[in-house]
């Protein structure tokens, strides 16, 4: 279905504690049922745990973790003459960030620590050190793109 107009980007405010737009996006992605205060408590709690364990700037570690998880290339399905090919394409910067946030959160939710604060802080520290489920997901996506490099001429 086509749209008449491109959807406008909504303006979001930076988070109150660190003044960072990406942390606000991360909170919004963690949030369930519009409960922003719960999401804030989880994210700020996780960043406090990271700060106490690593003894360095938690925001810098958060950004490093996001950068380590963000994919540079992915595969998209494309039908050509009755066959469906997995065509590798570059990932746009806004989508890179969105995928990194989504993968970090799903990896944290998949861990088996007691609280979400512990899970998220553990996953952030792992991702910052190029370990963990979220980084594995990125490597799988890159491996898939590498395996299908033969179809890269089907880009659109």
From Swiss-Prot:
Protein name per the record: Small ribosomal subunit protein uS7
InterPro entries: Ribosomal_uS7, Ribosomal_uS7_bac/org-type, Ribosomal_uS7_CS, Ribosomal_uS7_dom, Ribosomal_uS7_dom_sf
Originating gene: rpsG
Subunit structure: Part of the 30S ribosomal subunit. Contacts proteins S9 and S11.
Family from the record: Belongs to the universal ribosomal protein uS7 family.
UniProt cross-references to SUPFAM superfamilies, sorted A to Z: Ribosomal protein S7 (SSF47973)
GO CC annotation: small ribosomal subunit
Annotated source species: Bartonella henselae (strain ATCC 49882 / DSM 28221 / CCUG 30454 / Houston 1)
One GO MF term: tRNA binding
HAMAP family (UniProt xref): Ribosomal_uS7_B (MF_00480_B)
Keyword Transcription regulation annotated: no
PROSITE patterns: RIBOSOMAL_S7
Role: One of the primary rRNA binding proteins, it binds directly to 16S rRNA where it nucleates assembly of the head domain of the 30S subunit. Is located at the subunit interface close to the decoding center, probably blocks exit of the E-site tRNA.
Keyword line: Ribonucleoprotein, Ribosomal protein, RNA-binding, rRNA-binding, tRNA-binding
Residue stretches spanning the membrane: none
Any Pfam family: Ribosomal_S7
GO biological process: translation
């Amino acid at each position: 279905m086509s749209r008449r107009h491109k959807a406008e980007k909504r303006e979001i405010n930076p988070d109150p504690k660190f003044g960072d737009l990406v942390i606000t996006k991360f909170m919004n992605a963690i949030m369930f049922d519009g409960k922003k205060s719960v999401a804030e408590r989880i994210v700020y709690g996780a960043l406090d745990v990271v700060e106490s364990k690593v003894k360095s700037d938690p925001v810098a570690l958060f950004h490093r973790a996001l950068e380590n998880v963000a994919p540079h290339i992915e595969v998209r399905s494309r039908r050509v003459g009755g066959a469906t090919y997995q065509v590798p394409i570059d990932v746009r910067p806004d989508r890179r960030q969105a995928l990194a946030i989504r993968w970090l959160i799903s990896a944290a939710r998949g861990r088996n620590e007691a609280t979400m604060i512990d899970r998220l802080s553990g996953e952030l520290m792992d991702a910052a050190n190029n370990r963990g489920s979220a980084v594995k997901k990125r490597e799988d996506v890159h491996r898939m793109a590498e395996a299908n490099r033969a179809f890269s001429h089907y880009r659109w």
